[in-house]
Amino acid sequence: MDVSILRDVRPPVTSYAPNIWADTFSNISLDEEVQKKYAETIEALKQVVRGMLMAAATPIKQMIFIDTLERLGLAYHFETEIEHKLQKIYDDNVCGDDCDLFTTALRFRLLRQHRHHVSCDVFDKFLYEEGKFKGDAEGLLSLYEASHVRFHNEKILEEAERFTRQELSCWIKLQSPLKDKVKRALERPLHREVPILYARHFISIYEKDESMDEHLLKLAKFNFNFLQNLYKKELYDLSRWWNKFDLKTKLPYIRDRLAEAYLWGVGYHFEPQYSYVRKGVVLSIKIIGILDDTYDNYATVNEAQLFTEILDRWSMDEIDRLPDYMKIVLHFVMSAYEEYERDAKIVYGKKFASPYFKETIQQLARGYNQELKWVMEKQMPPFKDYLKNSEITSCIYIMFASIIPGLKSFTQEAIDWIKNEPNFAVKAGLIGRYWDDIGSHKRESKGGEMLTVMDCYMKQYSVSIQETISEFAKAVEDSWKEVNEGWVYTISMSKEITVQFLNYSRMCDASYNRNNGDGYTDPSFAKSNITALFVDPIII
């Protein structure tokens, strides 16, 4: 068929499930007095818990306490004290030849998660034959968790992950105090957990723990409910902002997913001081979603090309050249950008952020436009060419740009760094891209009518869909090793900046990595997480 004919063909339109939350978050009423009492109780309990942390007598007790604080979502209250304790544990080389497997693995994981350089050679003494490790149940679980902060070429940790996964899989069938921890760890290792989602889960586990401390549990519960009320207020404000555009009526082909977008914001930074980070993420995801659905689900190749060119010129002067639905899209993109520009310049004093945010929007549109041409003209490229374009359509750069105003340590130097496409960022983006390609294959193939990247891979390498999924999953594992290395070794940038790539990777894992689903498209997929974080408080 003549390719020029295909350029005016509209793709088969997917009808997405409606927004299941309706007006849940736009009709919220918050009691400020309750929030004030929560804050007062938290401050009092923090003093008690800080005393407990400082009084922990041995390095082992300190590490266990720090690990518990992090699991409960409380570590941000004691960041300075925790960093000081871990620095001393690192400097003193705690866990020489005397520590058991549990303690050795805990130290290794905590130090790597806090960007310390530690060698995996510490596990050599626990390897009693090829690929097998000696240790009790808690020790093997601790080793399993430690194995997921591994780098490339750390063979002993590859063996540890395989061995402990096999051993732990047998334990979930047994009645054991560790059963709940093991089951959750096998679903998603701790290092890949979204911190606030895991905290919500772990509070109920900690409550049943024989070693549970009442003050710590009480602080965790009050802290979570305080955060939840804050999230509800932010969701209320964002709902009112989103609803004023009424795009779900004007553009019926798009996914109406505000709560799901906000879930990503909380995944990036759940702490109260990062309110703008959450807003910025929502802003970027709404731009991403509308552009993605327009290019992928409605526009013809010729319409998309015109839109991309006009967006590249960043001018409303040519808007009348666009079809009516694209005028609405352009108006929204410009309006969202102006909101960002105002916040960046006036509220946060980061005028330098706006040009880069604009650049990432244009860059993303070009990436989507290229994908549309490949699909509609039925000329999928070699997989490596698709993968290069995927660095852009992973949305890692636009989402990174969107949070700049909310990060105190962010400077022009950080923008220059990210523009050089560091491997750390590229690999984080590919984690999202691979999981998205797996999760969205069924939707994007339009019942087999349209080509997807998985079709491209299957054809090029003559493999089945299951083999393709397996290869993509392996690529995710390799990318995680790069992300771990980037997290530890990218010391030229502050932790506040680099943690964004780690948390992006975690959110991708949570959004796409279960049953090959797509947590943004299918509202039922994210429902339990949204309910747990934004609807149901913890009973105190």
UniProtKB/Swiss-Prot annotation:
Mg(2+) 3 binds at D436, S440, E444. Its EC number is 4.2.3.92. Its cofactor is Mg(2+); Mn(2+). Keywords: Lyase, Magnesium, Metal-binding. A motif (DDXXD motif) lies at residues 292-296. One of its GO terms (molecular function) is magnesium ion binding. InterPro entries: Isoprenoid_synthase_dom_sf, Terpene_cyclase-like_1_C, Terpene_cyclase_plant_C1, Terpene_synth_N, Terpene_synth_N_sf, Terpene_synthase-like, Terpene_synthase_metal-bd, Terpenoid_cyclase/PrenylTrfase. Binds 3 Mg(2+) or Mn(2+) ions per subunit. It is an enzyme of class 4 (lyase). It catalyses: (2E,6E)-farnesyl diphosphate = (+)-gamma-cadinene + diphosphate. The Asp-Asp-Xaa-Xaa-Asp/Glu (DDXXD/E) motif is important for the catalytic activity, presumably through binding to Mg(2+). PANTHER family: OS04G0344100 PROTEIN-RELATED (PTHR31225), SESQUITERPENE SYNTHASE 31 (PTHR31225:SF253). Sesquiterpene synthase that catalyzes the cyclization of trans,trans-farnesyl diphosphate (FPP) to gamma cadinene. Belongs to the terpene synthase family. This is Gamma-cadinene synthase. It comes from Ocimum basilicum. The gene is CDS.
